[in-house]
Amino acid sequence: MSDKSYQPTIAGLRAFVAVVEKGHFSAAASFLGVRQSTLSQALAALESGLGVQLIERSTRRVFVTTQGRHLLPRAQAAIEAMDAFTAAAAGESDPLRGGMRLGLIPTVAPYVLPTMLTGLTHRLPTLTLRVVEDQTEHLLTALREGALDAAMIALPVETAGIAEIPIYDEDFVLALPPGHPLSGKRRVPTTALAQLPLLLLDEGHCLRDQTLDICRKSGVQAELANTRAASLATAVQCVTGGLGVTLLPQSAAPVESVRSKLGLAQFAAPCPGRRIGLAFRSASGRSASYRQIAKIIGELISTEHHVRLVA
């Protein structure tokens, strides 16, 4: 039974989060710079005070209980808030103390990371960034479970407990085989997709859903090509080989067209597109820092890519 007067300590919360993230008591103790016995005592005190078992102990590894998994994001948010409070009190100028675990979707990462990483290193030299590329659903799960701090994904996500910061809007362009009659056109109606074999990414990619949504809104019954691709780069190679056409985000077009001698066409207004932004846990104490990071990312990307910053 929990003690209603009990107040968890930051040491206990740090012990809990570290054990979950590192998967072993010894690794967690090393990460926190404390003895394993000290860490075990802090975690045991936390569980005793809460009246809840957070971790199942094993000689080989640890397992997070259902209650522990439910409470993990709140523990992480409390630690983040305390770190932000301490940093502010000390006059800390770094926007993110202790680094940032950033997720990106596969149709964003390869095209903006070179600009982002170089620019962030220059603008925020003390920022420690760890990058993870994955599909939207997996990134949102990682956010909810505390495995990521933030993620660059297509908005809106409309997921409980997740906050969004819009960064930029970008158009889609039509990728065509070399020499295609539509190549170079600037006002292709979206209804033209009805006469073209449309090549889609695998299920789970948000670009696939966005492409099908564009077809639905245009009243188009798309003729789907028999080929599906796991990545945008593979889709482009298939288009170059004459297996169909596909939609590309504007930020990806320069890279992919140079690689593959791809034909490109622009859609007629209103041009279909997407909004990219930064998602993070709404309970996080770092929302102001994430807004600063999002602003810098937008400024960096807009200098290299044809995107429109969201005010």
Swiss-Prot record:
UniProt KW keywords: Activator, DNA-binding, Transcription, Transcription regulation
Source species, domain of life: Bacteria
DNA-binding region: 25-44
MF (Gene Ontology): DNA binding; DNA-binding transcription factor activity
InterPro entries in UniProt: LysR_subst-bd, Tscrpt_reg_HTH_LysR, WH-like_DNA-bd_sf, WH_DNA-bd_sf
UniProt xrefs under Pfam families: HTH_1 (PF00126), LysR_substrate (PF03466)
GO cellular component assignments: protein-DNA complex
Cited SUPFAM superfamilies: Periplasmic binding protein-like II, Winged helix' DNA-binding domain
Domain HTH lysR-type residue range list: 8-65
Similarity annotation: Belongs to the LysR transcriptional regulatory family.
Classification via PANTHER family: HYDROGEN PEROXIDE-INDUCIBLE GENES ACTIVATOR, TRANSCRIPTIONAL DUAL REGULATOR HCAR-RELATED
Annotated function: Required for the induction the katG gene for catalase. Involved in the response to hydrogen peroxide.
Descriptive protein name: Probable hydrogen peroxide-inducible genes activator
